[in-house]
Amino acid sequence: GNVILFSDLNSQLAAFMVKHFNDRALKDQLRRLINEDIARHRSDQAYIGNHVKIVNTREVNNTIVHDDCEINGASRLSDCTILSTPAANVYIGTGVICENTIISEGSSITNSVKMQDCFVGEACHISNGFTASTSIFFANAYMSNGEACAAFCGPFTSSHHKSSLLIGGQFSFYNAGSATNFSNHAYKMGPMHYGILERGTKTASGAYILMPAHIGTFSVCFGKLMYHPNTRNLPFSYLVAYGDTMYLSPGRNITTVGLYRDIRKWPKRDVRMPGSHKSIVNFDWLSPFSVGEILQGKEILEKLREASGTDVASYTYH
């Protein structure tokens, strides 16, 4: 895969790996540095740290459990590393099955969650039968009921619904509506495609996006978006599918009260303890990155108006 899992992984390094691992020399150097770090911290055997509480748990196999962790009623923990600390302890609850997974400080995994080959970052909450495979979660991500496969869930990614599937995408500050779905099997070539939903994107109930796709910052997606939209330079938009046609309302989301509610709630919901801030979280919604997209979007819209005039019901943009 494109992301190497190790204890000190954060969202910035993971995103860097995903973006630049086509550079073979860079990939080799990163692998060397990470393997050196792993070698320094590798233990010859599994161990259980101080003040750990393990109750009614069926199987703990080849797992490193750090201090002040509580494991209560788990079904199986195999080949895992649990990075609990006295200030930010980890809780593993009833029915949980975790295999080959790293769980970071302050996280809780509860209520029959099933995870395989995953990384769980600091202060994440995963519960209520959520199923995850080959996925990574960072900094205050909240996952419940649904499933994730090959998903890059950055800080404050949120999915609450049983019928939601996050697959083959990179998300952050994202909220998945009920029955949200993605497909990374375009052209029947197998699961080789992926997409990016930039910071603050939301998908409405029943939304579907066919990858590859690139959705701009703080956009909202409605319906079945089938034609690989790339709206990176049109942030704060509504993307609405009617049949085979997708309509884009540029800047629509910047006028909604929900956007400003989200902007204010995220800093309050950062429950990471001091000393466990691995991922760098920038809460500013207007940054050089997002403002640059706004300026490019303004230029695109001005060119459309110049080409088609002002007396039209809609503009065609490819």
Q: At which residue positions do the language-model features occur?
A:
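Glycine-rich hexapeptide-repeat left-handed beta-helix
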Residues: G1-A25, L83-P86, Y91-N100, E105-D117, ...
